[in-house]
């Protein structure tokens, strides 16, 4: 069994989601053949932990913690960067440049880094989204829901009226589009259960050219078994026809809600689920310590 020190600049109780996620993966044995030796929060604690020995790797869960490592370190070191990480200062970039590998949640985070990087992707607790495991009632949406109309979620900051204008009058009138990025949508979706309930019960999520409700909203939708309709095509008839076809199926079924897309859920679980993320950490760490 290999041992890793987790290093964070945050005080106890104020750790980032990314740090807690990696710590949980180690503590629940989701990183095969790796265990957490300890967590340290400053350079002095790191020296003490290393002096105790039996450590294979130090992993910095935020860029500020990478400053704990001396330039002449004699141990393997990796770091993580997440989409919600604070903007990097030039000093933080210099510190990350000294680690052996930085694991990125998304490709866009590589900008400005000179160190070796690997895109590990996001980690998602798919069970929280999967309606077969956590089935959230439609009543969470009662204030805006109308079960006589086809429920759609708009996951980007786009104009609902422009979308409706591309549909026939009949289909437009039958659609209840919840604009997640609007003031009304933000007021409704003020808790994870409500967001997940919308993804579980919407016939589809529409994604346009505007900024997304969440950087990983398409992944969240897939984990909830919610189909995604791409509204960014050059010809709006492409997605307008798709919505119309979906409406025909919904109407033919008597307005009965769709079945979850089980294949989409399985894909997310296999690529970004908790165990998949643990295996990705194992692979990255094994490469570093074998160099």
What are these regions (language model features)?
Residues 197-213:
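Acidic donor-binding loop of glycosyltransferase active sites
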Residues 237-238, 251-289:
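A charged, aromatic-enriched C-terminal amphipathic alpha-helix characteristic of glycosyltransferases
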Residues 96, 191-192, 197-202:
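Short alpha-helical donor nucleotide-sugar binding micro-motif in glycosyltransferases
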Residues 141-161, 165:
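Conserved donor-binding/catalytic core segment of Leloir-type glycosyltransferases
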């Amino acid at each position: 069994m290999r041992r890793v020190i987790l290093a964070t600049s945050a005080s106890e109780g104020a750790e980032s989601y990314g740090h807690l996620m990696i710590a949980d993966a180690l503590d629940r044995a989701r990183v095969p053949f790796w265990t957490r030796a300890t967590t340290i929060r400053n350079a002095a604690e790191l020296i003490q932990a290393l002096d105790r020995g039996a450590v294979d790797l130090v992993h910095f869960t935020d860029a500020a913690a990478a400053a704990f490592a001396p330039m002449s370190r004699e141990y393997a070191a990796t770091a993580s960067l997440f989409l919600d990480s604070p903007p990097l200062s030039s000093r933080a970039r210099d510190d990350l440049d000294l680690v052996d590998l930085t694991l990125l949640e998304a490709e866009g985070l590589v900008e400005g880094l000179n160190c070796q990087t690997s895109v590990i992707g996001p980690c998602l607790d798919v069970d929280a989204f999967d309606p077969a495991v956590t089935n959230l009632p439609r009543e969470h949406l009662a204030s805006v829901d109308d079960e006589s109309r086809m429920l759609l979620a708009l996951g980007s900051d786009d104009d609902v009226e422009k979308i409706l204008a591309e549909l026939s009058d009949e289909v437009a009138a039958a659609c209840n589009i919840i604009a997640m990025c609007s003031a009304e949508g933000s007021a409704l979706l003020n808790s994870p259960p409500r967001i997940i309930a919308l993804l579980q019960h919407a016939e589809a999520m529409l994604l346009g050219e505007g900024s997304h409700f969440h950087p990983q909203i398409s992944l969240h939708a897939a984990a909830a078994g919610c189909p995604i309709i791409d509204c960014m095509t050059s010809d709006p008839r492409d997605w307008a026809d798709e919505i119309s076809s979906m409406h025909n199926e919904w109407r033919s079924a008597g307005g009965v809600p769709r079945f979850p897309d089980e294949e989409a859920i399985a894909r997310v679980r296999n690529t970004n689920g908790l165990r998949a993320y643990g295996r990705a950490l194992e692979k990255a760490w094994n490469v570093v310590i074998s160099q």
